[in-house]
């Protein structure tokens, strides 16, 4: 069973937005502050704990269960490893590409962990979820009320904002039945024009907050190459302080809301307002035109 005092959070966001990197760096900072944390990777790539463990997890719940014949044949210590600052790390895994439902791994893993006492003596459980998929098995942490606080990693790019709005729509669907709430948007900067202002505007429209603006810094890539979090690789760096600031905000966050997703027309109008998209009249003129024709 799960302790009712544990805060169960989940990080969602467009594929490639830096969600796993942002979540691991933030959770590392939270662990530095004395928080007891478990990460449940909900991505078939099984890379949600790589920076914590200095390596990709050698096995996953679903892979080992397939080898043994049943998840009941597993031992907790075989799939739960200890990483940086004592963070517990589990990867749910998934089937081979094109075979079966990857979301099944999430359901199987969480049930196994709950039944085997993995949730004892924890302050936070964090689910790191694949891309912007909010249907079926990948929505399971939301749908079943496992994750109570959702943090959406986004940026000032159109598709990242589009994904954030879609995820907000998924949260709204289960907000009343499961009690899930949106904790805020994390802007993982891509250095687009007026990016912080744009994401704050989007957050307001979604009835939430931009909980933190994470600036772009090459030190993140340097740490990743060494399979380390920034806080471990360069603890005194400015970027490390940014992740600590975000960690404190999540620990102290009491602004948990039911989101108000917006229509595509409103999102496009917002992008036009900030110069990401051309206005409709100009847009209509360039649709379907090759580069030479628009010079």
Swiss-Prot record:
The modification ADP-ribosylarginine is found at residue 104. Belongs to the NifH/BchL/ChlL family. ATP binds at residues 13-20. Homodimer. The reversible ADP-ribosylation of Arg-104 inactivates the nitrogenase reductase and regulates nitrogenase activity. Its EC number is 1.18.6.1. The keyword RNA-binding does not apply. Keywords: 4Fe-4S, ADP-ribosylation, ATP-binding, Iron, Iron-sulfur, Metal-binding, Nitrogen fixation, Nucleotide-binding, Oxidoreductase. Binds 1 [4Fe-4S] cluster per dimer. It is an enzyme of class 1 (oxidoreductase). CDD domains: NifH. This is Nitrogenase iron protein. It catalyses: N2 + 8 reduced [2Fe-2S]-[ferredoxin] + 16 ATP + 16 H2O = H2 + 8 oxidized [2Fe-2S]-[ferredoxin] + 2 NH4(+) + 16 ADP + 16 phosphate + 6 H(+). It comes from Nostoc sp. (strain PCC 6720). Its cofactor is [4Fe-4S] cluster. PANTHER family: LIGHT-INDEPENDENT PROTOCHLOROPHYLLIDE REDUCTASE IRON-SULFUR ATP-BINDING PROTEIN. The key enzymatic reactions in nitrogen fixation are catalyzed by the nitrogenase complex, which has 2 components: the iron protein and the molybdenum-iron protein. GO terms for biological process: nitrogen fixation. The gene is nifH. One of its GO terms (molecular function) is nitrogenase activity. The keyword Disulfide bond does not apply.
